Amino acid sequence: MPPSPGNNDQSSIQQAADQHAEEILERRRESRARRAAALTAHPQPLSIKTELTQVPLAGAAPPASASVSTTAQTAGYLLAVGDSWFDYPIHDILTRLDDNYGYNIESSAHRGDPIETMVSQVGQLDKFARGMDKIVALGATPKAILVSGGGDDIAGKEFGMLINNIDLIPVPGWNDQVIAGVIDTRIATAYRLMIVSINSLCQKDLGRTFPIIVHGYDYPVPDGRGFLGGGGLLPGPWLKPGFDEKLFSDINVTTQMMTTVIDRFNIMLQNLVQEPGFPNVTYIDLRKTLSNSQNNYKDWWANEIHPNAGGIFGGQDGWGAIAAKFQAVLATLP
């Protein structure tokens, strides 16, 4: 098990997160002031009255204290930062949480972003803070904050760097030192900074923290399929070219290799959320939600690294199956 960060590391992460949070909030204060001035100067600003009502889940009896309203019904407000699993064309986890469970979601997720980019000075947290303002303006607070990241730190054009050539006896396959550096150091450090930064932002701006949900990935099959098949200017494939580069051509072998590295990623997250200072963070294990069996994996996976949408797109609703795992956790929150 990789060691948890020491006190000095934790202190430096907290200091960096606090500074980043203060810089973001200073930009938000400037934006709020400009918006307030614009509305003051507006000849007829539109006033919108919203009524927040506790809405029971389908089939449940409404509590005695619930008011009756059709003004602003929602299962709750969510904030999200992340990668393509939160920002995929037409369907993704967030659209399923919206459509299937009734959440209102403010997202700063951007497909293709590595986790270390998300938390950088040019990352997603400024837009995250703007989304938080929008929720607060409605008189609400976030039910939870969702974080999806790390896949783009592993997959992509540099993926082959993680693999030793098949002929490099006695160490063909995953280069453990490189894997440790990428997953257990770079990605884990970026996750720590992301979580501490989000907590710092919320504490400084709203006086409290909120539940944070992170997730691992499921087991993919590196079959060479990109977005809409890939090729040309279309994104992908993300995995098979790296295996081809290192002369691994047996899809059964490479599928098992992906199981190994996905397990490594999930173990990192499982350990990370148990570190001191993260009592508000929950990890969701998505492994074995979708299939990686050669018999039916294409029913569940649209391409190498993204689930199927089902319906008119064919196959199973992989996004829906994953969103159901999120809902199982969200349903336990107040």
Language model features by range: what are they?
Residues 1-47:
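Helix-enriched interaction subdomains in cytosolic or periplasmic regions
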Residues 27-113:
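Serine-esterase "nucleophile elbow" of acetyl-processing enzymes
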Residues 85-181:
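Conserved SGNH/GDSL esterase-like catalytic core that processes O-acyl groups on lipids
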Residues 119-140, 188-200, 263-264, 268:
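A Trp-anchored, charged/polar loop motif used as the substrate-binding/catalytic surface
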Residues 169-192, 251-258:
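Surface-exposed cleft-lining segments at the edges of enzyme active sites
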Residues 187-239:
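Hydrophobic, aromatic-enriched interface-forming segments
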Residues 223-282:
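Substrate-gating cap/lid alpha-helix
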Residues 299-334:
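Histidine-centered active-site loop/cap adjacent to the catalytic His
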